Amino acid sequence: MHILQVITGATLVSVPFVSAIPSSTSEFLPSTAEQNSAVLHSQGRSPPRLWTRLRDSIIETIWRVPSRQHNPSRIPSSLSIPRAPSSIRARYGDDVVLRFTIRSQNDVQALIEASNILFLDIWASTNEWVDIRLAKDVVSSLLGLLPSSLRTAHVPIIHDLAQAVYESYPQPVSSVPNPHHAFSPSVQQSSETQNIFFQDYQPLSVIIPWMRLLASMFSTHVRLVNLGTSYEGREIVGFRIGVRPANADLPTERRKAIVITGGSHAREWIGVSTVNYVAYSLITGYGKSRAITKLVEEFDWVLIPTMNPDGYVYTWETDRLWRKNRQENNLQFCPGVDLDRTWGYEWDGSDSRSNPCSEDFAGDGPFGGRESKVIAQWALNETNHHNVTFVGFLDLHSYSQQILYPYSYSCTNIPPTLENLEELAIGIAKAIRLTDHEHYDVSSACEGSVSSHKKRRGAALRSMQSAGGSALDWFYHDLHVRYAYQLKLRDKGGYGFLLPKKNIVPTGKEVYNAVLVFGQFLLGRGAQDIDWEGDFQFPAHSRPNVPEKEYRGPDEEYEISNQLEDDDNENDTLLGFRTQKV
């Protein structure tokens, strides 16, 4: 067992076995569940076959899933981090990140105009603050362009960006897995301290072989799909997790699918790790958890960790804070487009978005980004030719801890399913809060983040980062996905895009719990006969009571304001919202 750990650890570092990923597959996942006798169809558990036991033993040994019974541990390091080397200092100079407090739409507009003039990098914005990266010697120029109300309304949140960037890269590990650790019989009860893969951020050269290995070991319900190739020729790879139940109706029925994406913006590493965490939890939970087994039978889950593989590789090899993809533009020295501004619905190439040097350059036209175009083509092909109906979409970004629903391009056009979108978003926020007491705000993507109570008191400020051409709007409007969200993950600005690795597992747990709520909501009445409580990765003291009587049928009236009022009550039920059969 110890030898296997050493070999696997070396593999994760050197990745000597990288080979071409199997060519694109559009076939459905297995049409029945007969290949996997471990599937649970009752509260009891069938004894696993020899291969299942062997496979799970290997998986437990290599990548141990964090325990859902303990609070997320913060992995200590006995190594002191040295000063950033000259190469990083040369790239980031004396850059800092400032947070401006905004109080009116005039403040928002002033910051937008000043940032456009100086070509500044807006990191994040909410209804209350805006984070901007700039060089120290540009601060005075920025303040000179702002009204007096903003000249003193700012504080530095990152004083030394170069050092922060250096510290965000993986450092030498201070310990190795304990070979004498007593392995638990369940993958889902393992210790997070043994979870090699999720102890740190991983480069693409490690992620792809890891995905290939999981797909080969769990072939009964997992496949790799190649959605297309990036501008630089890398394959855009995703997991497809799903299997039709043995008692399913005709295989010609349309298969419902849910898409979870990350890495559209290259520097948002936490989104990539979180998609992988959720995928791993679904893969290893099938056949062990009734809830996960039900979700995998009812839906195909397509999880794409890196929508922007070229940009992601570039953040590891050259510029940690690169945002766009890597395709060439009219200006050779300003490559790349913002992929989340290039989707076809309400594409907007005006103002700074028409400047190739802008961080949110929208390209020369709708689907001007190579990666967004091939993913859209894949989705349309699945819908038109492979009998798939997409019913859910979660696009993971960072940072600012927000749950955003359509539309991004406009605050005046209201989505027709607004009440349902808000209702599910609030349930997701509650699941996240119960995980580790982190508060995620809920709002329309066109607005800044606004708490539920503030939203009811008056109109929210328009977000500095709202725009047309977003994946969120395209999936919701053009692909008719009824439940589409963008989740902006941790944190609220202490680290921004440079979130320390100790947050990987806690953030993964938060989104995994959110996905369970998401799937449960979409199951409708089919969720009633399952005990969901045991599958949430909550600390023991945060586990909610879920009495059956709290279920609200689809015909029952539900006042969203009641849910908003109850959202601050730590003891209220998680499932106290109306589920929807899709």
From Swiss-Prot:
GO terms of biological process kind: cell wall organization; proteolysis
Cofactor note: Binds 1 zinc ion per subunit.
Gene3D superfamilies listed in its UniProt record: Zn peptidases (3.40.630.10)
Glycan-carrying positions: N381, N387, N571
Peptidase M14 domain segment(s): 200-522
Main localization of the protein described in the UniProt heading: other
Compositionally biased intervals (Acidic residues): 561-571
Keywords, ordered alphabetically: Cell wall biogenesis/degradation, Disulfide bond, Glycoprotein, Metal-binding, Secreted, Signal, Vacuole, Zinc
Disulphide connectivity of cysteines: C334-C357
GO cellular component: extracellular region; vacuole
Signal peptide: 1-20
Start and end residues of each stretch annotated as Disordered: 561-582
Binding site for substrate: H265, A266, R267, E268, R323, D340, R341, S398, Y399
Cleaved propeptide residues: 21-172
Gene Ontology terms for molecular function: zinc ion binding
Chain's role: Inactive carboxypeptidase that may play a role in cell wall organization and biogenesis.
Similarity annotation: Belongs to the peptidase M14 family.
Official protein name in the record: Inactive metallocarboxypeptidase ECM14
Highest classification ranks of the organism: Eukaryota, Fungi, Dikarya, Ascomycota, Pezizomycotina
The gene coding this protein: ECM14
